[in-house]
């Protein structure tokens, strides 16, 4: 494998050249004491969980310089049988371990071999946790070095840091999923990592070695030794950023506002791009032209030419991303402008950035420049990073400080070898570090007070590069944050594709919400601190010996006092919110209470107002005193109060949001409060949400945009775009400025998808009868399908009750049924569902859309209850107060679209087939039921008595298996 193919896109040439010589230099370079008497170790186990699995093999090698001078290898006899998949992966059989020593015996022998020397392992936490779970395992070594984390520091631009990838790349022994072979591979990679560390900017090793010396950190001796090889070297992050940015130059782009009309390919040229042998065919040799895709591409082209908007519902299989990419890329290239694509999901953004756009760039003469742009909190803040590395700020005590130092080292190395990039690609686990320690927000950014602003900064550098790119890929969240920030986040982009557009109203409402949160308030006051902690304490220490310190310290003392009062006052507010939450009806875990006329006129609310007004006054006093301190110090020492100024703005925002909600007279908003019933304290919040998102988009965003292409597979209700057009404001800007287009899927839904309506299920309001009948449907369906069933619930209570009833019956039948329990990871549930073809899943909202499991993995989707919003939902209550037919205008079409999204989980390729079971009797008993059925991708459905559903599914399954 060539180094060029092994590094991330955009890696500077000097980094590629350095990586290319590592293997050769590792053969001759010496590192003295740090490679004497070190142990390289690997284990094999019966699985990934230390609670449920056991060791089956341990291998270790003692290194002296470049030589292995001693070895330790043993099988381990587990108490459980080795699973077949582990035997297939490792070739270790139950016969191999039958006469092996027990785990206690093997680990004791390992401890004797190691003798307390440092241990190197790839993903050392895994190996260490298994070894130390055995009696005596803690005696093996006190020093464990994770070569996975070290490789991210030494080689930050590698596309992968898997041991097998690096071993192959640098010509080391191959990985074979056997402990002894993997140890040999790591012995070779270890020396490569040491050489790579010496290639990082001079002085960086010393900076890392000296970082927070009071924190025990296994990498410190390595960095300290390497720093000693270049004594006196001074590290400059600013200089390192300047070096890496030397070759990062781009042409300026034109603001499309300056162009009277766009130069675009003709319709015939667009059609040729999608014809056999055309542009798209060159990108994908197996591509076959689709009439629906060509029609969409032409519609997008016409919208760009005329400067108008389009709403395009493109069914599954149309290939909508390639339909808009080609005309949008041509618009950017021919007019020297930047165009934008906003997606909801990371999956689609990654598909565009790492697959479709690179392939398109390869086939276009002159190429195509593109970049991804994310929110501020995805990028390292270099000012914070610099202060952290110099020990000028405290490490968050709630996390392992060693993990924080490792994260600082990884980020430092990355920004020294990367012109741009974000935290998401660095393998830093969110649960291991406090991300706000390394990131900033738009309202917190120091901008001109920051030594890295603008060009050396990753946030503003990304924005600058976006302004020079042909295509910018971002997400709905950032797009709407940019609208709220009046365009200060994104470059001026006048032509947009809003993909996955069915969810943008909800996302805009979320992004524009004004929230007063107990958890965020607690974090804010922790950051402010007081006499001994936080930003106020830091300012006191920084100013203690300054000229004028008496004045400054007096202002600091006043600010500390008012902040303490404000902290107590806002805590009283959240106590009151929790009491008000007792009035909420419904909600299993969370109470969501509308702050409507009835509540505002109650005695409870009037009692609550006393603490609310007191908090507003205390917050305003704290805001004034902190701002006075910031203004006084900023005149002479602005760098001292940068962080405090950031926090002060948050304090002001908290006061303003609380005033807005308590006052409640701004009719643009609906007001509500939230309480987590499972917690005795914490989790309380108050929220003001925009009611009419369409009005806001029509006045604040669409006038700034020449062309917006709204695309999704789920937009119409009974073939009508009326609901969507109202939701995004297109019905407020004139009929001539936009048009809609429906494109049928290229898949044969009528043949491959069956829809079953259970016609005799009791009304859900008769809960026990309903659950009993639904239990029978679920059991029969799972048994008939043999697994591969996804059941989508609207509330946790029903899901957990039915899981308790159904799961034991599935277990007795040898079928696996999982449930989206509290705090469970949706990603892990998804991966488990996909990896086990016969498993089934009970799930909530996270799985109603965006969950793809093609083929035999998913053959049946069951929707027990139509997903109407709760009658007590604050937005629904506010709409009902203002409009007579609000339920039919909003709640009904929103539920129809959610069912369409859920149905879309079934058919993800032309060969997929499956059954959708709708078990809500209202589809039959209510007139609105037809809206759901006529909106589905197949026009045919069958009404079947619930007792016959299992038999029907058996026949359906047999018929489709014969077809294959």
Question: What is each PLM-predicted segment?
Answer:
Residues 436-470, 480, 485-487, 615-759, ...:
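A contiguous, basic/glycine-rich beta-loop/short-helix subdomain that forms a polymer-engagement track
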Residues 250-251, 256-257, 270-278, 336-338, ...:
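A substrate-engagement module of RecA-like helicase motors
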Residues 115-135, 156-229:
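Acidic, Mg2+-coordinating catalytic module of metal-dependent nucleases/exonucleases
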Residues 746, 758-769, 821-924:
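Conserved RecA-like P-loop NTPase helicase motor core
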Residues 264-312:
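Conserved pre-motif I regulatory segment
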Residues 2-30, 191-267:
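Acidic two-metal-ion nuclease catalytic site recognized across multiple nuclease folds
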Residues 350, 442-443, 447-471, 475-614, ...:
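Signature of the SF2 helicase/ATPase Hel1-core->accessory helical subdomain module
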Residues 2-143, 156-177:
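Conserved non-catalytic scaffold segment of RNase H-like nuclease domains
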């Amino acid at each position: 494998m060539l180094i060029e193919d092994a590094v991330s896109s955009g890696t500077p040439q000097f980094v590629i050249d350095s990586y290319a010589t590592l293997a050769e230099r590792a053969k001759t370079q010496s590192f003295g004491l740090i490679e004497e008497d070190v142990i390289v170790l690997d284990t094999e186990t019966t699985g990934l969980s230390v609670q449920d699995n056991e060791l089956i093999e341990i291998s270790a090698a003692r290194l002296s310089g470049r030589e292995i001078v001693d070895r330790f290898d043993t099988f381990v006899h587990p108490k459980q049988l080795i699973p077949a998949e582990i035997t297939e992966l490792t070739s270790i059989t139950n016969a191999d371990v039958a006469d092996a020593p027990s785990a206690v015996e093997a680990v004791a022998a390992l401890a004797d071999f190691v003798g307390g020397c440092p241990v190197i392992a790839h993903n050392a936490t895994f190996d260490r946790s298994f070894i130390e779970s055995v009696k005596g395992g803690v005696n093996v070594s006190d020093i464990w070095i994770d070569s996975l984390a070290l490789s991210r520091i030494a080689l930050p631009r590698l596309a992968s840091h898997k041991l097998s990838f690096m071993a192959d790349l640098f010509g080391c022994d191959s990985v074979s999923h056997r402990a002894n072979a993997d140890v040999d591979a790591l012995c070779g990679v270890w020396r490569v990592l040491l050489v790579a560390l010496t290639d990082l900017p001079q002085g960086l090793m010393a900076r890392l070695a000296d970082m927070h010396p009071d924190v025990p950190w296994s990498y410190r001796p390595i960095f300290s030794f390497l720093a000693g090889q270049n004594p006196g070297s001074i590290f400059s992050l600013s200089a390192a950023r300047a070096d890496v940015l030397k070759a990062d130059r781009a042409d300026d782009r034109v603001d499309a506002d300056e162009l009277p009309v766009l130069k675009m390919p003709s319709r015939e040229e667009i059609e040729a791009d999608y014809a056999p042998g055309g542009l798209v065919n060159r990108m994908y040799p197996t591509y076959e032209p689709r009439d629906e895709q060509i029609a969409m591409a032409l519609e997008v082209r016409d919208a760009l030419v005329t400067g108008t908007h389009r709403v395009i519902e493109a069914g599954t299989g149309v290939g909508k991303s390639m339909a808009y990419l080609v005309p949008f890329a041509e618009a950017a290239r021919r007019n020297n402008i930047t165009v934008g694509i906003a997606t909801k999901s990371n999956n689609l953004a990654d598909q565009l950035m790492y697959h479709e756009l690179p392939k398109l760039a390869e086939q276009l003469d002159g190429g195509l420049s593109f970049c991804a742009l994310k929110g501020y909190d995805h990028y390292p803040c270099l000012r914070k990073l610099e202060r952290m590395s110099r020990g000028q700020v405290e490490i968050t005590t709630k996390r392992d400080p060693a993990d924080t130092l490792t994260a600082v080292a990884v980020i430092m190395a990355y920004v020294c070898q990367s012109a741009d990039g974000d935290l998401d690609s660095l393998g830093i686990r969110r649960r291991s570090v406090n991300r706000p320690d390394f990131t900033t927000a738009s309202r917190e950014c120091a901008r001109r007070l920051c030594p890295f602003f603008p060009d050396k900064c990753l946030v503003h550098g990304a924005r600058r590069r976006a302004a020079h790119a042909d295509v910018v890929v971002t997400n709905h969240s950032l797009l709407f944050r940019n609208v709220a920030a009046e365009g200060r986040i994104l470059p001026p982009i006048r032509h947009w594709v809003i993909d996955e557009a069915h969810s943008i109203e909800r996302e805009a409402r979320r992004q524009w919400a004004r929230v007063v949160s107990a958890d965020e308030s607690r974090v804010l006051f922790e950051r402010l601190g007081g006499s001994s902690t936080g930003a106020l304490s830091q300012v006191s220490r920084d100013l203690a010996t300054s000229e004028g310190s008496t004045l400054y310290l007096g202002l600091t003392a006043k600010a500390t006092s008012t902040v303490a009062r404000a902290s107590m006052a806002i805590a009283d507010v959240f106590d009151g919110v929790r009491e008000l939450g007792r009035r909420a009806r419904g909600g299993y875990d969370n109470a969501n209470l509308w702050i409507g006329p009835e509540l505002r006129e109650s005695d409870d609310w009037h009692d609550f107002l006393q603490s609310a007004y007191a908090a507003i006054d205390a917050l305003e006093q704290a805001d004034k005193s902190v701002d006075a301190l910031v203004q006084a110090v900023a005149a002479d020492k602005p760098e001292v109060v940068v962080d405090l100024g950031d926090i002060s703005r948050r304090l002001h925002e908290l006061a303003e949001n609380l005033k807005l909600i308590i006052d409640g007279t701004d009719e643009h908003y609906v007001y509500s409060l939230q309480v987590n019933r499972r917690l005795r304290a914490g989790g309380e919040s108050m929220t003001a949400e925009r009611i009419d998102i369409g009005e806001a988009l029509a006045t604040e965003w669409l006038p700034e945009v020449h062309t917006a292409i709204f695309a999704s597979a789920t937009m119409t209700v009974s073939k009508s775009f009326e609901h969507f057009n109202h939701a995004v404001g297109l019905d407020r800007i004139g009929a001539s400025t936009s048009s809609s287009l429906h494109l049928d899927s290229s898949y044969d839904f009528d043949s491959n998808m069956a829809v079953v309506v259970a016609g005799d299920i009791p009304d859900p309001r008769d809960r026990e009868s309903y659950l009993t009948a639904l239990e029978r449907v679920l059991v029969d369906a799972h048994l008939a399908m043999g697994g591969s069933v996804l059941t989508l619930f609207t509330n946790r209570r029903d899901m957990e009750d039915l899981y308790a009833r159904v799961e034991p019956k599935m277990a007795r039948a040898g079928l696996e049924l999982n449930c989206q329990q509290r705090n469970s990871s949706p990603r892990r549930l998804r991966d488990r569902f996909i990896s086990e073809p016969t498993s089934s899943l009970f799930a909530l909202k996270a799985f109603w859309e965006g969950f793809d499991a093609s083929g035999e993995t998913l053959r049946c989707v069951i929707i027990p209850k139509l997903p109407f919003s709760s009658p007590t939902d604050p937005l629904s209550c506010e709409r009902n107060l203002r409009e007579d037919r609000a339920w039919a205008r909003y709640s009904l079409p929103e539920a129809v679209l959610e069912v369409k999204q859920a149905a879309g989980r079934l058919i993800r390729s032309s060969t997929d087939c499956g059954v959708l079971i709708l078990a809500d009797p209202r589809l039959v008993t209510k007139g609105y039921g037809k809206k759901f059925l006529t909106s589905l991708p197949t026009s045919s459905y069958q009404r079947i008595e619930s007792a016959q559903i299992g038999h029907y599914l058996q026949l359906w399954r047999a018929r489709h298996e014969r077809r294959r």
